[in-house]
Amino acid sequence: MLIFFCGKMGSGKTTLSKKIATQTNGIRLSEDELLSTLYPNRITNLQEYKQYSDLLKPVIEGITQQLLRKNLSVILDFPANTPTQRSWLKSMSDQEKSSHLCYFLDVSDEQCIEQLLKRANPMTDTKEMFMAVNKFFVTPQIEEGINIQEVDSETLK
């Protein structure tokens, strides 16, 4: 099974991904962790994020498909915040005839910003970055053909 997450910056996607990885004994891959390890201090704006994120995607796709072929649960802590991102994630499970689930974290902007400002990266974890990234956020729709599990802020506590 492939599990992925949709939620605004600071909504708790990483926290939930870690919890689910523990519960399912699945393999968790995190875009933030990979980017910060492979490209330390190189991402300071959205353009740089996209550039480096795009370099990861073909590698992650291959690894994910290999794991799904082995019937392992894969928890991808990669953003599923646009229809294009969700389509890419879903396509990996479709190609391997594996099931998928998208957790949608429905958390208010105020709560996201509050959580974001508590995080460790002062270069990217700012209200300004939240507003810039949030412009691209699209709530997932069942018409996209994805299995959605909604999670509210109370459930995340």
What does each of the following model-derived ranges do?
Residues 52-96, 100:
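Glycine-rich phosphate-binding loop used to anchor ATP phosphates in small-molecule kinases
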Residues 2:
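Walker A (P-loop) ATP-phosphate-binding motif of ABC ATPase nucleotide-binding domains
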Residues 8-9:
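The conserved Walker
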Residues 121-157:
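Small-molecule kinase domains that catalyze NTP-dependent phosphoryl transfer to phosphate-bearing small molecules
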Residues 96-115:
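Conserved phosphate-donor/acceptor-positioning beta-strand/loop module used by diverse small-molecule
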Residues 12:
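Conserved glycine(s) of the Walker
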Residues 5:
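Hydrophobic anchor at the beta1->P-loop junction of P-loop NTPases
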Residues 15-72:
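Conserved substrate/cofactor phosphate-moiety recognition/catalytic segment
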